[in-house]
Each structure stands twice: as C-alpha cells, then as structure tokens.
C-alpha cells in the first residue's frame, strides 16, 4: 500500500470494522482519516484503488475487510433495531423538549450511526441552559418516575 488515499481508505475501514460496520462509498468519503477530498472525481479514484487492494471486498453497496462479509448482515440487523430505538427516542425527546431549561437533545453512541444492538439502551445528550443542569436533571428524573422511560 503506497498512496495516501489507500492508507486513508484502509484506516477508515479498519476503524469501522471494530464496530462490525461495513461502509458505503459515501461513508468512506465522509470518514477518510488524514485525507481531504479535493475533487468530485474521488469516487472514480476510489473504485480503481479499491479494486487494487486485495484486502478490501465489495458486496451489496458495502465495502469491508476481507473475511468480514458477515458484517453486512450485522449492519442491516442493527439498522432495523436502530429504527425502533430512534422512534422511541423521538417520543421521549418530544416530551423532554417542553422542559424550559433544555437547549438541545441529541442521540449519541451506536444509535447515532444506526448501529445499535438489540440489547443496547438509548443514550441521549442533553444540553441545558447555563447554571441549570441540576434543575433540569431534577425535572427529568421526576418525569421518569411518572412513566416516561
């Protein structure tokens, strides 16, 4: 492996592989490590480069490391579980947004990239107005006691 692009592609795929997450070509472009895409023709360069790299395989719109084809199925299963969890997180956030001290509610963790396992919980990032963290926590805790979980 000699070019910077090849190293960047491999780095992105290795990192994603840690999470059993094959990447689409668009995601590879998004997650390239230490490489800036400077032209619209990078996808063509990528396809040529990927064909030359013996340790990268392609199937069903996904790129993955050799011997890891099974992670395509894993990703699809986790995407389905994530859809349900996002629906639940959306319902929760619609309620929590009425707490006047809440500035932002965001989804974090594996769910943020649609890679949530069936047994994973929903991780939310809550940003509050300055100086009102504990007030917000108190209000949210009380909401949780009354069935909002």
Task: Place the predicted regions along the sequence by residue.
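Helical scaffold of the NTase/Pol beta-like nucleotidyltransferase catalytic core
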Residues: 1-106
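Short amphipathic alpha-helical patches
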Residues: 32-36, 119, 148
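Glycine-rich loops and low-complexity Gly/Arg-rich segments
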Residues: 88-90, 129-133, 148-149
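Catalytic metal-binding acidic patch
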Residues: 109, 113-134
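Aromatic/basic-lined ligand-recognition segments
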Residues: 137
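Conserved catalytic core of two-metal-ion nucleotidyltransferases
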Residues: 140-149
């Amino acid at each position: 492996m000699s070019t910077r692009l090849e190293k960047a592609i491999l780095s992105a795929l290795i990192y994603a592989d840690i999470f059993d997450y094959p990447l689409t070509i668009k995601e590879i472009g998004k997650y390239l490590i230490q490489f800036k895409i400077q032209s619209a023709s990078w996808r063509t360069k990528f396809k040529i480069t990927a064909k030359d790299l013996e340790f990268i395989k392609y199937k069903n719109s996904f790129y993955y490391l050799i011997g890891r084809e099974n992670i395509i199925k894993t990703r699809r299963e986790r995407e389905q579980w994530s859809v349900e969890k996002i629906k639940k997180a959306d319902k929760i956030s619609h309620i929590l947004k009425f707490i006047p001290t809440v500035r932002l509610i965001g989804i974090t963790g594996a769910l943020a990239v649609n890679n949530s396992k069936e047994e994973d919980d929903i991780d939310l990032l809550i940003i509050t107005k300055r100086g009102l963290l504990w007030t917000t926590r108190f209000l949210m805790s009380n909401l949780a006691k009354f069935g909002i979980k």
